[in-house]
Amino acid sequence: IKYMTDGMLLREGMTDPLLERYGVILLDEAHERTVATDILMGLLKEVEKQRSDLKLVVMSATLDAGKFQHYFDNAPLMTVPGRTHPVEIFYTPEPERDYLEAAIRTVVQIHMCEEVEGDVLLFLTGQEEIEEACKRIKREVDNLGPEVGDLKTIPLYSTLPPAMQQRIFEHAPPNKANGAIGRKVVVSTNIAETSLTIDGVVFVIDPGFAKQKVYNPRIRVESLLVSPISKASAQQRVGRAGRTRPGKCFRLYTEKAYDSEMQDNTYPEILRSNLGTVVLQLKKLGIDDLVHFDFMDPPAPETLMRALELLNYLGALDDSGDLTRLGSMMAEFPLDPQLAKMVIASTDYSCSNEILSVTAMLSVPQCFLRPNEAKKLADEAKMRFAHIDGDHLTLLNVYHAFKQNNEDPQWCYDNFIQYRSLKSADSVRQQLARIMDRFALQRTSTNFNSKDYYL
């Protein structure tokens, strides 16, 4: 059995179009509809026509089964009953004007009024919101007086250091002598929807929002916007409350909003992304007729045209829309097309080692930490790495300092640097260097003391 990401399987398809080495392929969490999953489903549908021995299993806890069955030519459906406990769902009678305020109020009410022991999981949209909520919840509970049980607030988001993320598995504070219940409240982004299970959670608070990537093809900008979640995501959140015993879910929106305003499933990523990488991968896979490629949800023609224009401008496609030698090399790099072109072109400017480091740093989460309790110290530490010519050279300074200090986690801690991001960047850099070596692209650096260095 081989476990891999959908992106890895897609890369294998570039060298082995029929995926001959596999007899059974399972696509899990298909409801998330990532770009790689959507392309894979289109490819595997074609592969199945040529390989009668291949078995394809598409799995999900909250799948729009009918749509997937129809896409795969009325494939059979197998349902496995879940073993979750019953969860009582509550809605607000009126729409909430300020979901953050309502969420904090709900946490405090649960802690004060619920007579059942159990922890609380609150979903919010991002780091700033989560830190603000943790601070305000703690302040409000501390002001309630000694007769109320202790409440431990724990933030959870992807850029949090691993040691801090492990806090979600800590036990709740003990009950007081007067019987007041001690609880913990985990305030998380939507990574707690499917990625992990937190034992002890009985109460879930769902404001109904998450950050989603949105792409505007006209101005060619991707941004993260706070958007309403889908019914599928809402059901995933409900399921978090019934993992170990019966629970309650407090939805901070009306039942009418759930029934008539929410989409059934999350808007597929392929419909809200820059398709430059997608088009490059499909061209590398030998698929030239992009308009008729069997996407489950075809992207807008304008988005496809913008991607083709970009790749032509970068030299990855010729004027006929065919893949060039440069484009074929770019497709091998697991990067956005602009970054892939930059890495390949860096050999002509004798700076490929530096560009590898910058590209690796751009490919991992934010490396600068700025904890609430030490913002001034963190800003001062960041300024020590700052470069007058901008963020890219600032990131290069951080990477160089990390290597010069022997990748020391303590050095990262002292300088408010995210150790995990730097280790990831180091791995990405090694991977990119191996791809460069495969294409015999020379890795060079200009001597810092050379008079040509700043030309």
Swiss-Prot record:
<feature type="short sequence motif" description="DEAH box">
    <location>
        <begin position="28"/>
        <end position="31"/>
    </location>
</feature>
<dbReference type="InterPro" id="IPR001650">
    <property type="entry name" value="Helicase_C-like"/>
</dbReference>
<dbReference type="GO" id="GO:0005524">
    <property type="term" value="F:ATP binding"/>
</dbReference>
<dbReference type="GO" id="GO:0005681">
    <property type="term" value="C:spliceosomal complex"/>
</dbReference>
<dbReference type="InterPro" id="IPR007502">
    <property type="entry name" value="Helicase-assoc_dom"/>
</dbReference>
<dbReference type="InterPro" id="IPR014001">
    <property type="entry name" value="Helicase_ATP-bd"/>
</dbReference>
<keyword id="KW-0547">Nucleotide-binding</keyword>
<dbReference type="GO" id="GO:0016887">
    <property type="term" value="F:ATP hydrolysis activity"/>
</dbReference>
<keyword id="KW-0507">mRNA processing</keyword>
<dbReference type="GO" id="GO:0004386">
    <property type="term" value="F:helicase activity"/>
</dbReference>
<comment type="similarity">
    <text>Belongs to the DEAD box helicase family. DEAH subfamily. DDX15/PRP43 sub-subfamily.</text>
</comment>
<feature type="domain" description="Helicase C-terminal">
    <location>
        <begin position="106"/>
        <end position="286"/>
    </location>
</feature>
<dbReference type="Pfam" id="PF00271">
    <property type="entry name" value="Helicase_C"/>
</dbReference>
<keyword id="KW-0347">Helicase</keyword>
<protein>
    <recommendedName>
        <fullName>Putative pre-mRNA-splicing factor ATP-dependent RNA helicase PRP1</fullName>
        <ecNumber>3.6.4.13</ecNumber>
    </recommendedName>
</protein>
<keyword id="KW-0378">Hydrolase</keyword>
<keyword id="KW-0508">mRNA splicing</keyword>
<dbReference type="Pfam" id="PF21010">
    <property type="entry name" value="HA2_C"/>
</dbReference>
<dbReference type="GO" id="GO:0008380">
    <property type="term" value="P:RNA splicing"/>
</dbReference>
<dbReference type="GO" id="GO:0003723">
    <property type="term" value="F:RNA binding"/>
</dbReference>
<feature type="domain" description="Helicase ATP-binding">
    <location>
        <begin position="1"/>
        <end position="81"/>
    </location>
</feature>
<keyword id="KW-0539">Nucleus</keyword>
<dbReference type="GO" id="GO:0006397">
    <property type="term" value="P:mRNA processing"/>
</dbReference>
<dbReference type="Pfam" id="PF04408">
    <property type="entry name" value="HA2_N"/>
</dbReference>
<dbReference type="InterPro" id="IPR002464">
    <property type="entry name" value="DNA/RNA_helicase_DEAH_CS"/>
</dbReference>
<dbReference type="GO" id="GO:0003724">
    <property type="term" value="F:RNA helicase activity"/>
</dbReference>
<comment type="function">
    <text>Pre-mRNA processing factor involved in disassembly of spliceosomes after the release of mature mRNA.</text>
</comment>
<dbReference type="InterPro" id="IPR048333">
    <property type="entry name" value="HA2_WH"/>
</dbReference>
<keyword id="KW-0067">ATP-binding</keyword>
<dbReference type="InterPro" id="IPR027417">
    <property type="entry name" value="P-loop_NTPase"/>
</dbReference>
